[in-house]
């Protein structure tokens, strides 16, 4: 008996590494030390000496059950963008610049082309956020997972000068809330999505006029990465007072996380367009509005607060980065929380 007989194909592992190398190399930054295949990834911190008090920021996350959708559609080259986005967006909304990323793939069986396709998406997410993909792991789990299934997670590290961290402490009544458009459902709430829609290939290939695409393509749209937008805002000289990445828990859970005691966020629901995928999901699943806002981003993947005098500069900076901004509300004095009106 050998290792392959037990379900672990070492040669397939070697093959997948060879196939993914070209994608990984596209993410390299000058600070990356050494080549691929080492026992650890190395990244020089020489540049951060310019900062007064450098702070490392970290984030780890996965794509939830969105990976199941990728499996059914047999489309694996974008799910990696989601894994990166979920980590680097968290770092960015704290004021950080992503430095590097590591991915972890667990699979029932290593199919080299599929694994390389997943890593292609991870590399694309890294390029969008200017993070180097300096390491990763593909773990074959025979007997623990079905052969055609996998899960994907990642870990990111970023940096910022402590004085430039976005903490919410500068938040005050009169600040304006600006939301940045999402691409769709992003990477949370897919367990509910899978209860509402028939997750067969035939159903996912169904074209919906209101979506302008198939159901599967709309649901699989990669999570938008907001790193460049926040960097553009910073370069415009705007001080962001608070920032929230709208993920699991929607508006009601995530917006309060950016508030300090004694401040309340007021969001005007009609100030921006709710994406068609959310309207379809609510209709097909008979989901009430409060549950939708308590679960999904509803078309806004990130919400930030700035001084009223900085609104125009912030809007222009976001547009310059290729994102779509909306003035969606304000900060008031009051009990910490969020009001949707």
Task: For each feature predicted by the language model, list its residue ranges.
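Buried hydrophobic packing segments
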Residues: 20, 42, 87-88, 193-196, ...
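Acidic-glycine-rich active-site phosphate/pyrophosphate-binding loop
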Residues: 51-56, 62-64, 168, 202-205, ...
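Residue-level signature of catalytic and energy-coupling elements of molecular machines
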Residues: 9, 61, 174, 245, ...
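N-terminal amphipathic/basic leader segments beginning at the initiator methionine
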Residues: 1-31
């Amino acid at each position: 008996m050998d290792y392959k007989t037990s379900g672990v194909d070492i040669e397939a592992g070697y093959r997948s590494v060879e196939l993914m190398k070209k994608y990984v190399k596209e993410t390299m930054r000058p600070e990356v030390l050494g080549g691929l295949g080492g026992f650890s990834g190395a990244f020089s911190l020489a540049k951060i000496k310019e900062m007064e008090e450098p702070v490392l920021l970290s984030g780890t996350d996965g794509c939830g059950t969105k990976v199941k959708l990728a499996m059914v559609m047999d489309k694996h080259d974008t799910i990696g963008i989601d894994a990166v986005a979920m980590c680097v967006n968290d770092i960015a909304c704290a004021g950080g610049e992503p430095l590097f990323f590591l991915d972890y793939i667990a699979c029932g069986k290593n199919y080299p082309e599929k694994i390389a396709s997943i890593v292609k998406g991870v590399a694309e997410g890294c390029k969008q956020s200017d993070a180097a993909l300096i390491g990763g792991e593909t773990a074959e789990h025979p007997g623990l997972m079905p052969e055609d299934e996998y899960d994907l997670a990642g870990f990111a590290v970023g940096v910022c000068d402590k004085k430039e961290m976005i903490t919410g402490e500068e938040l005050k009544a009169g600040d304006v809330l600006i939301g940045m458009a999402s691409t769709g459902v992003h990477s949370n709430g897919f367990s509910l999505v899978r209860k509402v829609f028939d997750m067969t290939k035939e159903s996912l290939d169904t074209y919906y006029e209101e979506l302008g695409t198939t159901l599967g393509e709309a649901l699989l749209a990669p999570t938008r990465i907001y790193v460049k937008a926040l960097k553009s805002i910073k370069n415009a000289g705007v001080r962001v007072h608070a920032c929230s990445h709208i993920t699991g828990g929607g508006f009601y859970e995530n917006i309060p996380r950016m508030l300090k005691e004694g401040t309340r966020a007021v969001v005007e629901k009609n100030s921006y367009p709710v994406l068609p995928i959310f309207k379809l999901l609510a209709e097909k699943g008979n989901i009430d509005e409060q549950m939708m806002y308590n679960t999904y981003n509803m078309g806004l993947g990130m919400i930030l607060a700035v001084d009223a005098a900085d609104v125009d500069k912030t809007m222009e900076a976001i547009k310059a980065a290729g994102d779509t901004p909306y003035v969606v509300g304000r900060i008031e004095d009051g009990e910490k929380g969020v009001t949707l009106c």
